[in-house]
């Protein structure tokens, strides 16, 4: 809205002869200083290739082909490269309803029988769950014309076959098809792909017991699978979804501190001070009509109310942890789009130079992490890590790949794996040096990017950003110094130290996927047990995709529904056997 007013004002001034052209007011700007040094994923993490001029470089071994993920929730088990090892909890059914609630083979039992109309639902639930009814009565659904959108519209009327509405259910032609289709346009890192992301190529969702990653599962499933994650049920008030706090549920915390960066920065301060003043923030208006005194999350990332919630830039592959080639055409396109958002309130020159400052900060952080990483890598190569990867319990793949080669395609056996296999950060049961390296890039470096991107420069430097990386670099060097001195002393006096057994086995360690693979599939790795489904490489027609995956499942000896999360009153415990084999 303010951008429109700016253009209108410029046109009026031109008409009055006050200024010459729109371009002289809005386009002319100083060019940002180009940064020469570009640290790309292959340089920081050992990933293959050179700077990618397409701009489609992804971190963690994720590939652009991933975006071909076929969305078909009727397929079972949940489609993903590692779905054979994806462990579930009964509560997941509410976050992934089409897969874990709405199919007959997994639908929870219900003591109530019969079919009911809206009025009957309201009468009963006014006693059983009065809060739901109060919220529903405040909603636009309850007041829809010519007839209310009732309980039976979304949940069905057969109490033995009730459904839990998914985003697909909301996205029908009769309801919110436009919004559903807009959300579906998102690529990697978007709400439209965050659920499948956790199953296709990433290991952290299948490495541990499900209780360990419940928070990961909630935030990586519900935004893709349910509209009610952002649109508070059962009111579904758009005004609530337009407030920045609505994003806070997922977008905060150690390794993705979006909320903290926004909240403590100037933009967040303006929001917090004025958010109850309807003249400054009128959330009853659509985003396309918004005229806020400062930006909300939605104002910048859902331009004009479009449901494809956008990352402003992909130049930093995975939250600032490495940098893609800045000569890429896609980088320029993304940066221009980012500036076009900022210039609703700021001059393009101001926006570009602030973003260039962010670039410098991320570049410096990459240099700092490369130095930190090299200290740890040299300990590994020289064989003085305590313990070495071979002395730990098997990693997620059933091997002993060095944890800091995340997403890397290894150079050989020195890193514990075979050339072409990828690693995964170990956040536990690893050397202190590895854990500090993980926190340096995963917690501190990401926050430098988030802080600079959201106007929280002081926080990006002082609290959990640049100065935090300084501390961890010092700690890694100090630990490395001790390790080398101890190794030299042991060699001098002839001590052959054997690592403690607690690195290899323990009550909790034995529950991890790696030890399970070694015990139950001797000589196999997760790469042998979970070959790439064909749809990771090609865009088959849906029927072909289903046939291909079902054939692969049959070859692996997995039957459809092996991940079923039945939870009947007979006492069956789905957590006890949440996978067919595990």
Curated annotation (Swiss-Prot):
Q: Which residues bind heme c 5?
A: 227, 230-231, 306
Q: Name one Pfam family in it.
A: Multi-haem_cyto
| Free-text cofactor note | Binds 8 heme c groups per subunit. One of them, heme-4, is an atypical heme c (unusual heme c binding motif CXXXXCH) and is called P460. Catalysis takes place at heme-4/P460. The other c-type hemes mediate electron transfer to the external electron acceptor, which is a cytochrome c-type protein.
Q: List the Gene Ontology MF annotations in alphabetical order.
A: heme binding; hydroxylamine oxidoreductase activity; identical protein binding; metal ion binding
| Binding-site residues, heme c 7 | 297, 300-301, 454
Induction behaviour: Is highly expressed (at protein level).
* Signal peptide bounds: 1-32
GO CC terms of this entry: anammoxosome
The entry marks the following residues as binding heme c 4, namely 216, 219-220, 462
Q: Which Gene3D superfamilies match?
A: Hydroxylamine Oxidoreductase, Chain A, domain 1 (1.10.780.10), Hydroxylamine Oxidoreductase, Chain A, domain 2 (1.20.850.10)
Enzyme Commission (EC) number: 1.7.2.8
Q: Which UniProt keywords apply?
A: Heme, Iron, Metal-binding, Oxidoreductase, Signal
Give the cofactors, semicolon-separated: heme c
Q: Which residues bind heme c 1?
A: 121, 124-125, 159
Report the subcellular localization.
Anammoxosome
Q: Specify which residues bind heme c 3 according to the UniProt entry for this protein.
A: 141, 170, 175-176
Q: How is its activity regulated?
A: Is strongly and competitively inhibited by NO and hydroxylamine.
Q: What does the record list as GO biological process? A: protein homotrimerization
Physiological role: Catalyzes the four-electron oxidation of hydrazine to N2. The electrons derived from hydrazine oxidation may be transferred to the quinone pool and exploited to promote the generation of proton-motive force (pmf) across the anammoxosome membrane.
The subunit field of the Swiss-Prot or TrEMBL record says: Homotrimer; subunits are linked by two covalent bonds between Tyr-462 of one subunit and heme P460 of an adjacent subunit. May form 24-mer of an octamer of trimers.
By what name is this protein known?
Hydrazine dehydrogenase
Q: Which organism is it from?
A: Kuenenia stuttgartiensis
